[in-house]
């Protein structure tokens, strides 16, 4: 592996690589790599190569698969492209340049695709101008973007005359590989570049892409050089395996790939900002105003500031507030629910330095080149070490630039998490990449796409799929089950549906039926559909963006809402569309979108526990604790003092601090007479949600009562009634590691999570189509059809509970049910992590404490105020028993007096409990009501 220890850059005329994995050293002069025109242009423009370029070019020139892992601003993109451009220029000058695509660049974001297209077109134009000055005419080298935003007329033009370089997304590459015209244009591809590969490898989108890559290699019929570009990852070898596939692994499983691992060597200026007012369990309006004012103050002394928020609703709110402080012309939002034209306009203004502030979700998280950004602000926490590095890396996006980021925690728990983030960054910690194992819904979709283009022998098809790294361990019986499902379809009340393949058992071949290709083209992809309504500006019909279905349905004609930092008045709501007009100057509502909140990574959760324990160990020495937080977690003194005070107040009530080595059960009364049980367990929401669902199921069966429950990154809340009495220590014995997955599976089946994931699985497997007859199927119809398919495949789940003979639901052996449950247990939740936690409890490796308290500790305040995304049941916000807890604010030294009662109060309560008896009947009633026989 080529490592970051090579810090000396080579001179402009040579490009030297270090020793490869086998210890061999090779040196290739630059003049042997590039055409003189390209070499001259590069030296004029850049002077000399960056380390990523110097170490990557020789391997790429030799046709080796290459993974370049380096921070933003290190020249990764040009390192990947320049050899390819050089070959195209040489072929153009030799007269051998053909009208076929020779390179494909894939990025996970549309914005990144548009940015790379612009950044490639400029060098090509400059090289052609340089050639003209040398009296040399270079034929046109065509570059084209193909994404979901590409207009139909452009797609048709590219089908007739393919570009030499395709710039696309995973979904559009899949469409090109499935359509007849796209396949013809891709047959000559010899270079494949996968940018920001780490951003997709850990999800089903990456599994989908991995099969598309293998399909491209088969279509090309010749070796394709695979080039991967990645941020710093752990383990980097796993990313390399994902890049090259199983056909390019040695017998020991090592990737046959040149790994250029530069590491994260950029200078960083990261800090935490807290308001002067006290942080609490939720962000108050006063705190918000102070935070937004501070962001505006920082933005005013920087060229361009990029502000990240975790939700689209928050993006719109922050952009609106900042525009009131800084002027509407200086602020713009950017997120996926804005129209293509709006997003492109914001990106162009950013690149040209016309915006002071852009507020974005993850839509601008990856490597779009915006050189003017010199500050990144993160509102709340990103829940991930890697995402923090990715986001703050948008600043100083030039060679030698300094990464500058400011974190704005909005609650006390986010303050501790922000400290843990900076602690992790200072120590070079990274989130561990985990690649999902052979997802069957993606497999189903890709098999339909593959077989709709040509006939395959089933054995050959199985071998092709297993070449994709996520499918390296795909069991043959699972593959056969999916093929059988696609060939027979799903039996329903109206006959069989979703039968896309014809399986010839005699000749062992499979081919697509009529309609298979259309279904694969119009309903493919790994990203689940959102139930969104288009927002259309009248009278010109311009698409402004989208809003969530529930928001559209709950709105009325005349309502004013915010989208894209502009106010719109609703004129009419139609099926799937909201017709609007400009409402500039009127006070708008902020729309909402519903989705799953990002979960904190296990590596960051570990760092949260380290920081908590470090504070707990130094509570006796306030100044020493503050110094430790300043030195090791990068907190300013006011933030460090606030962290010390928070942990100190919590320990005063619980006598200990919860960490990943110490779980505390806390129980207290609420105002309704019931009790709230809090499990303080900072394992992250994926483990805690699994734990909470399983506990809720056990409580339901033990007490015959459906509990309200919630789970956050740092704990679990169970709302108990007056009848739920048990020794508090018993809560740790309710679940055992050897049976928790079965209990959790039953809990998931009765939760809203299963129905959502079921619909996603059906859509990805093409059992539930997104389009039919050229029109999009409305979300409400999709939900109805998903329910019908559930009744056909899994009648026990869809049936009436009163007719069940057993409390457990028998789970059928069906690939779609299997995949949905696996999604719930291992993607949305972390059942493996929960099992390991329970094993540690059973082995005594985690300390267990039980505390009945007179008042809730400050550690419980955030979960008691949890928002709906944390709920584990379907009770609405206004009916939550946790909201009946009175969280009074007292000084810590006064908290010990909360359980004391005055003698007068005791006498008054006694008189109320034992009524005055005046005759025999009243004595009888008193004895019946108060005495237990």
What are these regions (language model features)?
Residues 543-554:
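Short alpha-helix capping/helix-loop boundary micro-motifs
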Residues 566-573:
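Short beta-strand-centered aromatic/proline hotspots
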């Amino acid at each position: 592996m080529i490592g970051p220890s090579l810090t000396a850059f080579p001179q402009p005329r040579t490009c030297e690589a270090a020793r490869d994995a086998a210890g061999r050293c090779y040196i290739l002069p630059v003049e042997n790599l590039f055409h003189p025109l390209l070499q001259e242009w590069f030296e004029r423009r850049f002077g000399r190569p960056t380390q990523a370029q110097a170490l990557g070019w020789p391997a790429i020139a030799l046709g080796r698969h290459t993974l370049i892992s380096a921070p933003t601003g290190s020249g990764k993109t040009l390192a990947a492209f320049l050899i390819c451009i050089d070959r195209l220029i040489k072929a153009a000058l030799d007269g051998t340049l053909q009208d076929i695509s020779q390179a494909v660049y894939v990025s996970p974001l549309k914005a990144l695709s548009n940015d790379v297209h612009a950044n490639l077109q400029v060098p090509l134009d400059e090289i052609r101008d340089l050639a003209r000055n040398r009296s040399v005419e270079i034929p046109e080298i065509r570059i084209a973007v193909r994404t979901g935003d590409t207009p139909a007329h452009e797609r048709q033009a590219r089908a007739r005359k393919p570009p030499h370089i395709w710039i696309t997304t995973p979904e559009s590459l899949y469409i090109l590989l499935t359509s007849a015209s796209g396949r013809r244009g891709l047959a000559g591809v010899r270079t494949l570049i996968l940018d920001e590969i780490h951003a997709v490898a850990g999800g089903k989108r990456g599994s989908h892409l991995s099969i598309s890559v293998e399909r491209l290699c088969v279509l090309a019929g010749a070796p394709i050089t695979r080039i991967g570009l990645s941020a710093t990852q752990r383990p980097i070898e796993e990313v390399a395996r994902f890049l090259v596939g199983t056909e390019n692994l040695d017998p020991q499983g090592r990737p046959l790939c040149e790994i250029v691992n530069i590491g994260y060597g950029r200078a960083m200026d990261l800090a935490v900002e807290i308001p002067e007012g006290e942080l609490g369990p939720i962000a108050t309006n006063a705190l918000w105003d102070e935070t937004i004012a501070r962001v505006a103050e920082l933005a005013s002394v920087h060229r361009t500031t990029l502000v990240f928020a975790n939700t689209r609703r928050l993006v719109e709110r922050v952009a609106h507030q900042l525009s009131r402080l800084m002027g509407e012309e200086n602020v713009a939002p950017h997120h996926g629910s804005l129209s293509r034209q709006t997003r492109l306009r914001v990106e162009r203004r950013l690149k040209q330095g016309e915006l002071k502030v852009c507020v974005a979700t993850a839509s601008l998280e990856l490597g779009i080149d915006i050189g003017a950004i010199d500050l990144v602000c993160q509102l709340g926490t990103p829940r991930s070490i890697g995402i923090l590095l990715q986001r703050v890396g948008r600043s100083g996006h030039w060679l030698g630039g300094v990464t500058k980021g400011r974190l704005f925690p909005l609650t006390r728990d986010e303050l501790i998490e922000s400290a843990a983030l900076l602690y992790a960054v200072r120590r070079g910690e990274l989130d561990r990449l985990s690649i999902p194992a052979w997802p069957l819904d993606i497999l189903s979709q890709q098999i339909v796409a593959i077989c709709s283009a040509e006939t395959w022998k089933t054995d050959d098809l199985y071998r092709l799929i297993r070449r994709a790294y996520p499918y390296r361990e795909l069991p043959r019986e699972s593959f056969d089950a999916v093929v059988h499902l696609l060939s027979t379809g799903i039996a329903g009340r109206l006959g069989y549906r979703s039968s896309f393949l014809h399986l010839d058992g005699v000749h062992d071949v499979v081919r697509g039926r009529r309609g298979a290709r259309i279904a694969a083209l119009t309903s493919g992809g790994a990203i689940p559909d959102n139930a969104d309504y288009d927002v259309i500006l009248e009278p010109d019909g311009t698409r402004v963006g989208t809003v969530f279905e529930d928001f559209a349905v709950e709105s009325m004609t005349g309502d004013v809402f915010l989208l894209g930092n502009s106010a719109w008045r609703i004129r009419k709501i139609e099926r799937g569309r909201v017709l609007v007009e400009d409402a500039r100057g009127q006070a708008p509502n902020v729309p909402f979108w519903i989705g799953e909140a990002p979960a904190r990574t296990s590596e960051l959760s570990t760092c949260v526990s380290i920081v908590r324990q470090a504070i707990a160990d130094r509570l006796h020495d306030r100044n020493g604790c503050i110094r430790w937080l300043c030195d090791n977690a990068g907190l300013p003194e006011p933030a460090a003092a606030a962290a010390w005070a928070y942990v100190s107040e919590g320990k005063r009530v619980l006598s200990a601090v919860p960490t990943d080595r110490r779980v505390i059960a806390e129980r207290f009364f609420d105002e309704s007479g019931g009790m709230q049980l809090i499990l303080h367990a900072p394992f992250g929401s994926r483990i805690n949600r699994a734990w909470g669902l399983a506990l809720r199921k056990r409580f339901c069966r033990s007490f015959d009562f459906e509990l309200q429950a919630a789970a956050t990154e740092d704990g679990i809340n169970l709302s108990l009634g007056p009848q739920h009495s048990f020794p508090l220590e018993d809560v740790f014995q309710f679940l055992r590691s050897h049976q928790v997955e079965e209990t959790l599976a039953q809990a998931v089946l009765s939760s809203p999570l299963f129905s959502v994931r079921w619909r996603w699985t059906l859509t990805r497997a093409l059992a539930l189509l997104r389009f039919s007859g050229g029109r999009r199927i409305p979300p409400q119809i999709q939900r109805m059809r998903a329910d019908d398919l559930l009744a056909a495949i899994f009648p026990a789940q869809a049936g009436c509970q009163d007719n069940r003979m057993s409390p457990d639901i028998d789970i059928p052996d069906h690939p779609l049910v299997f995949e949905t449950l696996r999604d719930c247990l291992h993607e949305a939740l972390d059942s493996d992590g929960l099992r390991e936690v329970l094993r540690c409890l059973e082995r005594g490796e985690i300390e267990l404490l039980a505390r009945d308290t007179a008042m809730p500790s400050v550690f419980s305040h955030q979960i008691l105020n949890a928002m709906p995304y944390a709920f584990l049941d379907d009770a609405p916000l206004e009916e939550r028993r946790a909201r009946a807890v009175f969280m009074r604010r007292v000084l810590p030294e006064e908290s010990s007096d909360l359980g004391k009662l005055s003698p007068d109060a005791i006498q008054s309560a006694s008189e109320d409990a034992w009524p005055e008896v005046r005759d025999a009947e009243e004595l009888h009633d008193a004895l019946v009501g108060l005495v237990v026989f």
